[in-house]
């Protein structure tokens, strides 16, 4: 069941969501290891700064949605996947951070971010079979980031939806939550459509390339 808040956020971010899906296009034909690695590096550049911020937001851990934000899971999963693609630990530490970091300091803004992040987790369940078919990677080997929380993904999404909706009603912060979700989509779009070094994302290769099966 979709909550009133999440319906509002879905409508507000629909256009950006479609643009980002088209930009990433993981399930499109012709996905290569180089391009897949470049996409993972881009995700790492955002999550490596965003997840610690979310974990540090005061009051967020008091909400009853049990998302275990302190573990910064997605950054760790991205690192695991990049290691499978042949990138060294030192190389992963040197990955560029997003040129447009999304700053999060309060609960409403954090909830807007979590809408985007946890929603992407739902999409990840569709992406894993695409990556496995084209690249031979699996949910536990090279595609850990997109596999996310696996079978628990749907329950996490519903729990977040109910909790965020209750919080927004109680604090009258619908507009702030919506703006944060919109802004984070824009952060992703900017970072995936530009390159600090002047090279297109299609041409950015991961160091190593050798995939250990």
Give the label of every model feature segment.
Residues 1-213:
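Metal- and O2-centered redox machinery and metal/ROS homeostasis
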